[in-house]
Amino acid sequence: ALALTPAFKMKFWNIGGEGQVLIGGLAAAACMICLGDKLPNAVVILCMIVASLAAGAIWGFIPAFFKAKWNTNETLSTLMMNYIATQLVAFYTIVWEVPKGSGKIGIINQNTNVGWLPQIFGSKYLLSIVVAVVITIFMYVYLNYSKQGYEISVVGESENTAKYVGIKVEKVIIRTMLLSGALCGLVGLLLVGGINHTVTTTIAGGQGFTAVLVSWMSKFNPCLLYTSPSPR
């Protein structure tokens, strides 16, 4: 929900969070599988972080570019990107399946734990909580006290007003969706590298769609996300 909030505040209806999470997780899994026996663990994790952020950002950039240039319907384009991401994960599940013919990847680097994110106090969930808190603080400051956050608010209220005061709407749309997609990609990293240590087409578990409702119920306020009742 944190990842979708800046886009929603801009009135860009990013329904593609699920796909952006999947593609970020796929990028993390690719690093674990392809680099796990070639590079030190710390370097692999660094590559996973960069790859997941970049993959999510690219997945967010594509519908943003079409929206900015040709005013396409972002609800449809982001939704369709979910299906593409799902099929990509399904394809690479077959490519990387272990054992062959099983139709699944299984636990990645189970013997070496290369690419597994560190646990805090023996829990694989605490790291995700810490990251969520840090991003919440960042997002609150970004949306309420930065020039970029102000531009997001103005574009969300009225694109015509934004253009009148000299805000480059196309730039704001693309920049905001790069951020939104990157944060979704980070979620994929945490799911693959920190919790599940594998990737499947269902690894996001519908969180991308649940996040839409949670973000709405919190009125796009990062600090209120934790008080919003989950619809699940």
Regions found by a protein language model. Name each.
Residues 1, 42-43, 47:
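Membrane-interfacial amphipathic/re-entrant helices at transmembrane-helix boundaries
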Residues 20, 24, 28, 51-52, ...:
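Alpha-helical transmembrane segments in multi-pass membrane proteins
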Residues 4, 8, 28, 32, ...:
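Structural signal for membrane-spanning alpha-helices in multi-pass inner-membrane proteins
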